Amino acid sequence: MTQSWQTIPEMVLSAADRFGDAEAVVDGPLRLSFTELVTRIRCAAGAFAEHGIQKGDRVAVWAPNSAEWIIAAFGLLTAGAVLVPVNTRFKTEEAADVIGRSGAKAVLVQQGFLGQDYAAPAGVPVIDLKSDFLSSGSPFKQDVSGLTGTDISDIIFTSGTTGRPKGARMNHRQTLRMYEEWATLADLREGDRYLMINPYFHTFGLKAGLIASFLRGATMLPVAAFDIVRVVELVEAERITMLPGPPTLYHSLLAVPDKGKLATLRAGVTGAADIPVELVRRIHDELPFQTLMTGYGLTEAGNVTLSRPGDSFEDVATTAGLPCEDIDVRIADDGEVLVRGYGVMQGYLDDPAATAEAIDGEGWLHTGDLGAFTPSGRLRIVGRKKDMFIVGGFNAYPAEIEGFLLEHPAVAQAAVIGVPDARLGQVGKAFVVVNAGKSAVTSDELIAWSRDRMAGFKVPRFVEFIDALPLNATGKVMKDRLR
């Protein structure tokens, strides 16, 4: 489909005319039509403008999925600002680093979520999403912000092997084009009822969730924290048709005793972890889904490959599908997946060295993932060059976790790998060499200590104490020996 919008606000604001009184958002007792939602977004844009937010300013949102998140994010984009979503699982220090380096002029939070009070770095105003701020502005008029398609729309931070999160910058035009194709291949339709368990701070939740729904006219139902009992209740009560999520979601749905409660489900999307062929077969046989799409993507490039309607169970389970339109994918001599095309990011924020390392002179993004093509041209991801592993859909980076562990006085050396887990796909296992002169520490104590210092998905589930890490001639840990 040829889309005429150049910017995300242009597309989002047009939803009032395109879908009118159709239901746009359901969040608890709150129900808004597209007309009502767009009105609230315009008011939020006015509030940001009156707060001094101007074109190109960055605003962080550090909060769980909610109607207010949607209104705030698209309100600040409409005012011409750049959205900086922040992972709700980050501890205060982790978030402060990202917010500080983003140069955010404000940060929006939901106080008390997951028992945490959110605070920003000194000098950055904190606005509670549940306050009356979003409704306090005069409705913002379209096009006042003067945005173009090549302006940056969002900066989503991703961790590298150095452990220091890097902000991947994307523009309006590439985002709109990319998720138009996603919506088509995922079979997202006008009037679909889309239950959103993927967090909005993640590319999937924000773009394959919110952007795609505004493109198509799907009803958005945000879920703040995953709870399978609540998910099943919502599927039945709200007649959910679209339900993407990690493989763990589908495992949970297969265990639901009364499958009749799930009868309205039509389209699913998964990925981010290895999927057994038998799981895909069971999803088709035991659940009402008519389509199940998978794919491969990354923060720095959005969608790279997606499966196609009619793909076999084996193709959906064991490959990430075919390259997206006008996206080139090739496998380097060392097996690394390289990506080139309109979807590649506009570079890392304030980090030209890291950008040059990631994107070579010919425009190829070096993903750090290892892959191969099947005879049918589908991409199969075979490993992670940078040792990243995926815990329930969240990327975990060993170098970052190792850095935290080394802060413990009893830890001399640490190496973290991903190990299989039936529920989460993978979890972390730490191999630790203790400091001889320090008091001993048990695995349970180290895990508990870690829980206080890093997001839950990063915390190692297992700790094994060893006398020495296996090192190569240059002093690098040979993690294949640990597996």
Segments from the language model and where they lie:
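Conserved pre-ATP/AMP-binding loop-to-beta segment of ANL
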Residues: 3-5, 20-21, 139-157, 164, ...
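Gly/Ser/Thr-rich phosphate-binding loop
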Residues: 240-245, 254-315, 328
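Conserved ANL (AMP-binding/adenylate-forming) active-site segment centered on the GW(Y/F)…HTG consensus within
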Residues: 313-317, 322, 344-368, 374, ...
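Conserved AMP-binding/adenylation subdomain of ANL enzymes
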Residues: 176-193, 201-242, 256
